[in-house]
Amino acid sequence: MEQLTSTIPEWLAAQPDSPEPIMACQCVLARNIRDFVFPECCIDDERRAIETRFRSLLKNNSFMAGGDYYVVSDMDNLTMRCLAERRLITYEMLCANGPRGVYITYNQSLAVMVNACDHVAIRSIMPGGKVREAWEQANRVDDALGNLLDFSYHERLGYLTRSLRMVGTGMKVSVLLHLPGLVMMRLLHDLEAGLSKQHLQLSGVVVGDPRVPATPANDALPGTAYGLAAVVEPAVCQCLYVDMLGNLTAPLAATTGNLFILVNQDTLGLSESEILFHMKQALDEIAEREEDARRKLMRERGATLLDSIGRALGLAGSARLLGMGEALLLASFIRLAETQGHMTGLDRNALNRLLLECQGAHLQVMRGTPPEARSLATERAALFRRLLSGTAIN
């Protein structure tokens, strides 16, 4: 596990051939074994039998890329949170009970969860907008497992899943997007309306753990205002989790760091190829609209934009405390400044890694930071200062 958490996932690598607004994508295939009820209705002996059957297939077959199986009962809560921050397990897996585990490939582009929402959930993660490559990787594992396990399948409905929203293909494709131009030009809702007609849902991202009240602590000194005090969330809320069904999403106006999730709504009545086709078309349109919005923003509000970028870079390069939400917003302006040619010397791969490593569990595991909110905020600020050392504003 130490080797896993110290290795940077391949899906974080910057893609020179992919538009910057499209950061990463994943494809999930949910499957259930015909002999058992859904995991939440299983007793522990049944969950254990499902896990044993899956692990025996791993041992006796070579259809999976190199990796390891991790039993949840062998991991502490901090390690589980670290995996959730890496998008290798979902929030449902983090909160589930009973025997369960996850197989993770060494490059962390593939994870197979056992006994989360469904008996098996195959998760493939790719950089940029490689949605078809993500599906192809997941589909190869699905085909191999389907030959060895009797998956629940209905001739008319397709694959049967714990959630009705997954019945059919059992496939969810989601893409992480960075859309500051559309946000600042107030064009996001027009985009959302068009996407909903294509049966695609655009949502904001949520910082934190829904089980914990995320009221930030404002440690402002008397006489300070206008953003001169850090806003630091509780320690367990300094994270970004993902879930299977979109329950960890926010309204567009409430998102953090100009980040958004695009996901297919339909799993019934469309084939996998049709879902991928619609998603790819939408991503091309989104990238074009975002680039147009950035050009328009620079043309119409250039001085204001450059002032905001300068303020963000000054804060990110000097602050001694950074909350998670604040850090994501600063990272958005850093990314925007670099892609629009307003700063030099930035390593975009380092910025991508920072978005992973600045989360609470990663700071504790990788840097030994104490699990107190201010300690995490202090270390996060140090990471940003280190990132920006050697950079310059044009």
Predicted regions and their residues:
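Short glycine-/aliphatic-rich beta-strand segments at the starts of folded cytosolic domains
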Residues: 173-179
